[in-house]
Amino acid sequence: MPNPKKTVNWSHLWLYVSPPILGGIIGYFTNDIAIKMLFRPYRAIYIGGRRVPFTPGLIPRNQERLAKNISDTIMGSLLTPDELQKLARRLLKTERVQGAILWLLQLAIDQIKTDTDKKSAKIVAGILRDLIGESLPRLLKVLARREDFLEAQINQIFDQILLELQLSEEQASRLADWFLEVVLPPDVIRQAIVDFLTDRTIQIIDESFREKTSGTYWVVANLFGLRNTLTRLRTFCLDEKEATNNRLTELIQDLQMRDRFRKILQNLTLQNLPIGTVRQLRKTTRETVRQYVQTSGSDLLQGLTDSINWENIAELLLNRLSNSPVVISSLEVVSQELALILERYLEKDLEAIVAQVIPILSIDQVIVDRVKSTSPADLEAAIEGIVKNELQAIVSLGGILGLIVGLFQTAFFIFSQQ
């Protein structure tokens, strides 16, 4: 006789329901349990002086090797030289570089304005002192050897200033007064007459007057001569100083020497000279300046440097530049030009620069040190956070797979009883 068909005993419902439920629960929490098993315990446990197996957890026990593997993975696949070059190009775009340079220039100007210790002024003063006192003299000494040294500049100064130079009426009057009061006062003229009328000079004048005159003047020269007259004049100038000075003063006034000198000085200009003379004078002036700069220019600039307070000049210069609208408005243009120069340089040498920067930055060692210095608890919390925030689908998938496995077990159990 055939065996009677077995029926499912629904009184044992928990045997059919528990596998899917338990499988889903186990599958859902397996990831968290696995992560905790990788990290726990954080430290080694010793019993009777012997370390308990599997303590500490797998990751704390091999944290240094893990750090090295993470560093190798990142540097080998994520932060490759090509990727770093792309990153550098994005960071060093012209607009960003220009903005950074502009910010630095503005910061420098603000720093100069608020520089109470005058450090910037001292630096600029040192630069100016070295430039004017040391570098410029050597440069001028070399340039002065050229035949055309400052030729155009000296010619321009000569043509536009010296050639057009002419004293005004007031200037000519003051210069004439100075000439008659300081250079040639009556006492100086008197002394010049005395010095001029020596016995030898008087003899020469007298003989020349006798030989070269004719007619009535010859009779006067040979009968009376000039020796006695000139001798008496010299004696009078020596013995009667005050009277001589008064006579000379009256003579200057009667002859209107002051007005004569004023007119001469007022009409004195290079334009009245012949063209050939002016050209020769201009050439002589140029050669004189060149020769002076070549021989004595260094000493002149050195003495000038020693007599100038460069710190005050530098401070005035910096204050003027920091408040100049032209400088402030040109910062953007300067930053743009510098950014373009840097861009052209980076286009050519970026690969070499990145190759040099990578060892300097030691990114791989930074990653290793950072992972090694992170406590196992912090690593565990970080991985759990990533799993919960970014890998939640895997957790849910684990629960679903556990549920499916439990359903298969229930189905197998049901079919095995039939």
Curated annotation (Swiss-Prot):
* Name of the molecule in the record: UPF0754 membrane protein alr5253
Is this entry keyworded Transmembrane? yes
Q: Which family does it belong to?
A: Belongs to the UPF0754 family.
Q: Where in the cell is it found?
A: Cell inner membrane
List membrane-spanning regions: 10-30, 394-414
An example of a Pfam family matching this protein is DUF445
Q: How does it sit in the membrane?
A: Multi-pass membrane protein
Keywords associated with the record: Cell inner membrane, Cell membrane, Membrane, Transmembrane, Transmembrane helix
Q: Name one GO cellular component term.
A: plasma membrane
**Coiled-coil boundaries:** none
Q: Does the keyword Transmembrane helix apply?
A: yes
